[in-house]
Design a protein with these regions (language model features):
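Helix-to-loop junction immediately C-terminal to a conserved catalytic motif
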Residues: 52
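Conserved ABC ATPase signature
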Residues: 137-141, 145
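A short, proline-enriched helix->beta-strand linker immediately N-terminal to the Walker B motif
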Residues: 156-160
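Short coil-to-helix segment of the ABC ATPase nucleotide-binding domain corresponding to the Q-loop/switch region
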Residues: 97-105
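Conserved ABC transporter NBD signature motif
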Residues: 60-68
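Catalytic Walker B motif of ABC-type/P-loop ATPase nucleotide-binding domains
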Residues: 162-165
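Hydrophobic anchor residue at the start of the ABC signature
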Residues: 151
């Protein structure tokens, strides 16, 4: 379970202080799939970075499975980070190696075992229907395929939480729909998914819960 309790945060800009969150409160249950919505600058990416423990709010607490991130011991931070997968809008793949080697590198970078790498890679590529791409290099595949590989990398170690930041922003409608279908498959693996998006085609066709960050004290609500 994730609890956002009285989160306040602001940034200093040339024009002065920009308030991002003012007493933000929300509760996210285990295994939920929710959307973060709001206009540009509303704090969607900032909140994801807070959940990654990359940004500490000015005040308030973020509690994940009973652990307050504000007081997370330094030695435990790498273990916490390994429990989270991240999928961004842009394709952050190693360009000069194969899809397989991109996933292999991700396993080793997060402290995974080389001994189990082949089994993990085979499983996730098959689950996402992209096993035929394993020998291809990023420059040899389409944008939609690159995003699928990035998704495979994000879940290669079966994280407890998957943070997704505008994953359909650079994709055509068909590729966007395919990414959403694959996220549903991943969600069925008992992974909590928190997805930031301003894609109206996604928002308007969902019955999932939404946190609207345009409301400075949002309640988690259901799309009507």
């Amino acid at each position: 379970m994730i609890t956002l309790s009285h989160i306040n945060h602001s940034y200093e800009t040339e024009e002065g202080k920009l308030e991002v969150f003012n007493d933000l409160n929300a509760l996210i249950e285990d295994d939920e799939f929710i959307f973060l919505t709001g206009k540009s600058g509303s704090g969607k990416t900032t909140l994801l970075k807070m959940l990654l423990n990359e940004i500490t709010p000015d005040s308030g607490d973020i509690i994940v499975d009973g652990v307050n991130l504000r007081s997370l011991a330094r030695r435990k931070k790498p273990y916490y980070r390994r429990s989270i997968g991240v999928l961004f809008q842009d394709f952050r793949l190693i360009p000069d190696v194969s899809v397989y080697d991109n996933l292999y590198a991700a396993i080793l970078a997060t402290g995974g075992s080389a001994r189990d790498a082949e089994k993990k890679i085979t499983y996730v590529l098959s689950m996402l229907g992209i096993d035929h791409l394993h020998k291809r290099h990023p420059q040899e595949i389409s944008g939609g395929e690159k995003q699928k590989v990035c998704l495979a990398r994000a879940v290669i170690n079966h994280p407890k939480i998957l943070l997704v930041d505008e994953p359909t922003g650079n994709l055509d409608p068909a590729s966007s729909a395919e990414i959403m279908r694959l996220l549903d498959i991943i969600h069925r693996q008992k992974i909590t998914i928190i997805m930031a998006t301003h894609d109206q085609s996604v928002i308007e066709n969902t019955d999932r819960r939404i946190i609207d960050l345009d409301n400075m004290n949002p309640e988690v609500c259901k799309h009507e």
